[in-house]
């Protein structure tokens, strides 16, 4: 009995552990599918999904990004290839391979229970997929248990299919119609790969092959819609482009729902070998782009000719083909037979908030919201400007917000002709907007007349709140410069608008608007003496016409100190929300340019959360770096040449000095020798030279054959001492 239980346990363990191969794990689609499957228990989709499980799964999917790198027991073990040898191994993968030979790859495939080949992202993978299914089919006789081969293809192999009902073009295609499908001209290789997989997949019991035709994939990092997300998020264009009339219907599916379909194929091993994976939506290109623009962009779209789509450098031919397809499809078998925990069953538009959240989290595009406060002349604006440039944030100053809001209201009130190609606003709504804008302008004018040109807090708070809730600030974030100044201003600005109870009890956490509340509060400060000295040293050109004039500055400084004495300061408000300010005493840093303060704030805030440098900015940075390098090299070369010239001059000077000293030494030696040779000369002239000269003269007169012998004989005979 015990042995049977042990055998059953082992069998269960074998069943519950499956090794899954997926190609190109470092790509968008394969990566998300692999991550999803690595968190799925083998066989889980065979059980019916209850409402409670769906709620739990929603919470689980939100935490998918932070999933543990450790392989969980009973889940699919993911292995696969990488597109680049230097790509990092995904955390969810047990093994990865790159630059591997076909022989070695086949050995790896034979170790797996499920082989998934994704041909939606790289046309180069089709030939390898056909080879893989062919090679595996030849090894069927050696299989110990059944293996599954899943080809992840695209609905573009249906793009030119004839309508099922000529009189009703809205009748969707289903899996049952796969024999009637006609491919887009650019996807003929895809449909050939599908046919090959279906051919091999029906030959053997131990080898089942499936084709899953997926719609345009979205979700997570954005997929093929990422270009539109990026354009909207950056906010650099007034309207998102729609290619053509935008009425073409695009079959779509969330990438995690596609992963759910694959999970069900693995668990259920269905009878149909061709499946369609699309959501229930019937969205047009215009619907999708308009939804993106409204929820994370300028809110407008602009229809442009299809030909202009090819000028968009970030869109590949493959992306354009998917975006311009006009095809209605229904995943009938998937909907009726599979248990899928849908992420976006109703489609892209209905789930845009969740999709946007995934997109921003996956790409690290969370906004950075900063509030910089402090006394006048402490350096708020200069520091805010530097931080805004570094983090690519919107620098918000009160005067600019007010001017912009009033200008916008005046533009609404002024007659506005609707241009050709723009969307017309309904007349009733337009009239209502004009009336509201005119009423608000009248109120602003009256308020400024009654307050000596100053605006009431109610208008300031309204304009500031609208600015902080604008799409650019929601996307990239903001740096709020010198506002709010008081506790009440902060409370009115950041508290929830729909708050029913106004409780003035301090010390409790008020409900605040998470959309606009700052993440970092920077409290700059310095002594009054330091601030006065800084203002005194400012150039007259900067001081003229600003609040830095002596009377206005002293009054502003006094007001700031007065409102920050009691326990109801603006800093207390943030403390109550547990957003503790970063206090920096600028006066103690002794840095006129505030570099140390900026460096300290960057350290506290962290790295930027954006797309980084654009191609143009990278090129500009590279150009500047090249110029700096050339200038540095030129300076180094000039310095080297100068150093060599100096060294050569010093060498010549030393040589000349040495020669001069040598000549001096020689002269001294000559003088010494001359001084030493005087007695010798005197001796020679007295005792030797007279006789020698006579002998030489005599030798010249006689001219003997041997003059030397003659001279010697002469000197011997005429030696004065001998005589």
UniProtKB/Swiss-Prot annotation:
One of its GO terms (biological process) is cell projection organization. It is found in: Cytoplasm, Cytosol; Cell projection, Cilium, Flagellum. One of its GO terms (cellular component) is motile cilium. Residues 367-612 are annotated as: Adenylate kinase. Residues 537-547 are annotated as: LID. Residues 679-723 are annotated as: DPY-30. Keywords: ATP-binding, Cell projection, Cilium, Cilium biogenesis/degradation, Coiled coil, Cytoplasm, Disease variant, Flagellum, Kinase, Nucleotide-binding, Transferase. ATP binds at residues 377-382, 587. AMP binds at residues 432-455, 482-485, 489, 555. It catalyses: AMP + ATP = 2 ADP; a 2'-deoxyribonucleoside 5'-diphosphate + ATP = a 2'-deoxyribonucleoside 5'-triphosphate + ADP; a ribonucleoside 5'-diphosphate + ATP = a ribonucleoside 5'-triphosphate + ADP. Gene3D superfamilies: cAMP-dependent protein kinase regulatory subunit, dimerization-anchoring domain, NAD(P)-binding Rossmann-like Domain, P-loop containing nucleotide triphosphate hydrolases. It holds the Pfam family ADK. It is linked to Spermatogenic failure 27: An autosomal recessive infertility disorder caused by spermatogenesis defects that result in multiple morphologic abnormalities of the sperm flagella, including short, irregular, coiled, or absent flagella. In the central section; belongs to the adenylate kinase family. In the C-terminal section; belongs to the dpy-30 family. Nucleoside monophosphate (NMP) kinase that catalyzes the reversible transfer of the terminal phosphate group between nucleoside triphosphates and monophosphates. Has highest activity toward AMP, and weaker activity toward dAMP, CMP and dCMP. Also displays broad nucleoside diphosphate kinase activity. Involved in maintaining ciliary structure and function. This is Adenylate kinase 7. The gene is AK7.
